[in-house]
Amino acid sequence: MNPLKPNLNKTKLILTLFIFTLTAGCNRPASSNTTPDLFATLQASTPSNFASPQVTQPVSTPAFNFSTITPTSSSSSAQTSVPSPSSSDQPSGHIAFTCQVFKDQGSEQICLMKADGSDFKRLTTENNLRHFYPSIAPNGQSVLYSAYFADNNFEVFQLDLVDGSLDRLTSTYGVDTAPEISPDQEQLVFTHIAPATDKYQLVLADHDGGNFGNIPGINGWDPTWSPDGKAILFASDKNGTVQLYTVRLDGSKLTKITNLPAIRGRSDWSPDGQYIVTYSGEPWNRELYIMNADGSNVRQLTPSGGNSQGPSFSPDGKWVAFTAYFDHYGEDNGCEIYIIRIDGTDLRRLTDNDYCDYQPRWGP
C-alpha cells in the first residue's frame, strides 16, 4: 500500500507540532540514494567561522544524593544498586548530536565529537535544511539521522564515517525520525508520522530501508533497541499520559515500564540490559532518572537545576550523555552536552557554544 501524498499545509502543522513537542504492514517503496553533493562528507566538516568548543569542563555542583521515587513495576524482583565505577574509568567512543550552529530552528545540523569533547566535527553542511535525531551504528562506522528532503517530508539518512558516502534509507510521505540500527545491524527502527492519520507509529525496516512495516498495534515515538535486539523501548500516550513501554518486534508483550510525571520520550537502555535512563518533569525543571529495566528502583540521576534531558548510555554503560542548561539556565541558546557517571558523580560539560547542542547519542 502506497501512502497518499499529503496536504502540504497539514504536513507543515504536523511538522511544527512534532518538532516542538519532541525537541523530540505496508510495503515500503524501493529505497534510493541522495546525490552526494547535497550533504557534507567528513572532509568538509566544520566551517572555519565555527570554532571548536572548549572541552571536558568539570561543572561545580553541590553534593547530592539520589532522589528515590516510588517504583511503578509490580514485579517482586529485588531492587539492585547502581555500581560505583572507579575514578580511572574515563569516557570513550564518540557522541553524535544535533547542533544549532546558526541559532535558528530551521537549520539544525548534525555534529560529532569524541566522548571527552575533543575532535569536534560538523557532519552536515546543507545550511538551510533541518537535521535531527542522530544515532551512531553499533560498529561505529556510520551515523543515522532524520533530515528534510522534499515536500515538507523528513527521511532517514545514513552517513558513512569511513568513506563519507550518504544514503537515503526511507522514501515515504510524512516524517521519519529518531532512527536506530539494531545491535546485530540488520534492522532499523524509527518513528513515522503519517499525515493521513497524524499518528506516531513505530516502524521496522531492513538496514537498507527495505521491508518497511509498522510494529502491529503500536503507536509511539523515540524507539530504542534492547541490547539483545528482541524488544523496543519507546514512549506512548496510549493511556492518556506519556509513559515508557517495551514491546516485542511482533507487537507482543506490550509492557508499561514507568509512571513518572511529564515524560517526554527520549530514553535509553544500558548495554547490559540492566538499566533504563529517561527524563521527566515540567519545562525548565526536567531531570534524568535511572531505574531497573522493569521500571523499579527509580532514582534521580542529575543534580537539580539543569533542566536535564535526552539521555544516552555510553557503550560501556558507565556514563550517560545528555543535554542540560547548568551553565546557561533559561537561555534560548543555552543547552550544552554533558556527561555524568551512572552513580550521579563526575558531572562534566563537553560543549561550550553560543548555540544549542542537544539530542546526544553515544556510540563506539
Model-predicted segments: where are they?
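Bacterial N-terminal signal peptides that target proteins for export
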Residues: 2-13
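Accessible peptide chain termini
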Residues: 1-2, 117
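Sec-dependent N-terminal signal peptides
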Residues: 14-19
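Sequence signature of WD/YWTD-type beta-propeller architectures
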Residues: 26-364
